[in-house]
């Protein structure tokens, strides 16, 4: 019995020590460093409106359906973060063609002035996560005509808004230029007032 206790005692102490270190100390240290060094990212990269209310995250897209606003990428999960992922169909899958055709039909209904051949691919295809918050500057620009007609905001102002909200490639070489749809729509909302 004494031998059993002598074997169990260090096992229990080591387990408890690592439980405290890995379950409490390490997470607190990492959280403290993250809050000190990159508070915005540690808090979820939240975006606030003029009333200082949280309206979303710059990392997760939202579904904008009002034709007066810029629309983001198609999302097969309807931008529900808990359901992240997409039906990434193979090019040979007929369901992919159906999904793209539906996206194109939706586009035609709201953007009659822009031919389908001018529509950037990111407006009619899903992303891998289904949560992309960004679109290409071209994808934003092709929506200017519709938004200008519905809001009476001059196209030049909308073009400048897109230019102001365009973020370059990370470190100048990773990724492509992009526009965060939520941030763009918040700025658009200011112009509507």
Curated annotation (Swiss-Prot):
GO terms for cellular component: plasma membrane. The chain crosses the membrane at residues 14-34. Coiled coil: none annotated. Keywords: ATP-binding, Cell membrane, Ion transport, Membrane, Nucleotide-binding, Potassium, Potassium transport, Transmembrane, Transmembrane helix, Transport. It is a single-pass membrane protein. It holds the Pfam family KdpC. It comes from the Bacteria. GO terms for molecular function: ATP binding; P-type potassium transmembrane transporter activity. It is found in: Cell membrane. The system is composed of three essential subunits: KdpA, KdpB and KdpC. Belongs to the KdpC family. PANTHER family: POTASSIUM-TRANSPORTING ATPASE C CHAIN (PTHR30042), POTASSIUM-TRANSPORTING ATPASE KDPC SUBUNIT (PTHR30042:SF2). This is Potassium-transporting ATPase KdpC subunit.
């Amino acid at each position: 019995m004494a031998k059993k206790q002598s074997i169990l005692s260090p096992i229990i102490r080591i387990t408890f020590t690592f439980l405290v270190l890995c379950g409490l100390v390490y997470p607190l240290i990492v959280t403290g460093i993250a809050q000190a060094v990159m508070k915005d990212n540690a808090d979820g990269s939240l975006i606030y409106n003029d009333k200082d209310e949280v309206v979303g995250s710059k990392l997760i897209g939202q579904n904008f359906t009002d034709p007066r606003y810029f629309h983001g990428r198609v999302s097969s999960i309807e931008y529900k973060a808990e359901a992240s992922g997409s039906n990434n169909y193979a090019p040979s899958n007929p369901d992919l063609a159906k999904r793209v055709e539906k996206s194109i039909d939706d586009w035609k209904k709201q953007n009659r002035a822009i031919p389908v051949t001018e529509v950037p691919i990111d407006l009619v295809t899903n992303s891998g996560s289904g949560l992309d918050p960004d679109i290409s500057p071209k994808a934003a620009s092709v929506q200017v005509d519709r938004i200008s007609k519905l809001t009476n905001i001059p196209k030049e102002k909308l073009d400048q808004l897109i230019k102001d909200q365009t973020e370059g490639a990370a470190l100048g070489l990773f990724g492509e230029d992009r526009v965060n749809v939520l941030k763009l729509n918040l700025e658009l909302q200011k112009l509507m007032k």
